[in-house]
From Swiss-Prot:
It catalyses: a 2'-deoxyribonucleoside 5'-diphosphate + ATP = a 2'-deoxyribonucleoside 5'-triphosphate + ADP; a ribonucleoside 5'-diphosphate + ATP = a ribonucleoside 5'-triphosphate + ADP. The modification Phosphoserine is found at residues 119, 121. This is Nucleoside diphosphate kinase. InterPro entries: NDK-like_dom, NDK-like_dom_sf, Nucleoside_diP_kinase, Nucleoside_diP_kinase_AS. Its main location: cytoplasm. Pfam families: NDK. ATP binds at residues 11, 59, 87, 93, 104, 114. One of its GO terms (molecular function) is nucleoside diphosphate kinase activity. Its cofactor is Mg(2+). Keywords: ATP-binding, Cytoplasm, Kinase, Magnesium, Metal-binding, Nucleotide metabolism, Nucleotide-binding, Phosphoprotein, Transferase.
Amino acid sequence: MAIERTFSIIKPNAVAKNVIGNIFARFEAAGFKIVGTKMLHLTVEQARGFYAEHDGKPFFDGLVEFMTSGPIVVSVLEGENAVQRHRDLLGATNPANALAGTLRADYADSLTENGTHGSDSVESAAREIAYFFGEGEVCPRTR
């Protein structure tokens, strides 16, 4: 299986619950290497840009408001089949449908405040990583 990179966000509601370390531990226990991470507070412009594909949808303004309501943690995870395995660990987007033991089952509050984000394809992962990480901010892992 090919080594992939995927993009992850720990959203404001999960950051506020002080579960960043718990989530990172679950990433590592699942076999992911954390090759880039940082905490930031999105501006409205950054949030609108990141979620531009949803502009015009009924939930867009609420999503932007939520994503700018507090700090987030963005990370790049590396591993075999990383995109799909990360999405499996996150659970269903709607936490009401998330299986027990997934991050959204454990840390989500609602459909919008679902605790985490994960790329849905290798292509979107590359785009999302480039949105938040510049040259030299993601480390190569050799071990």
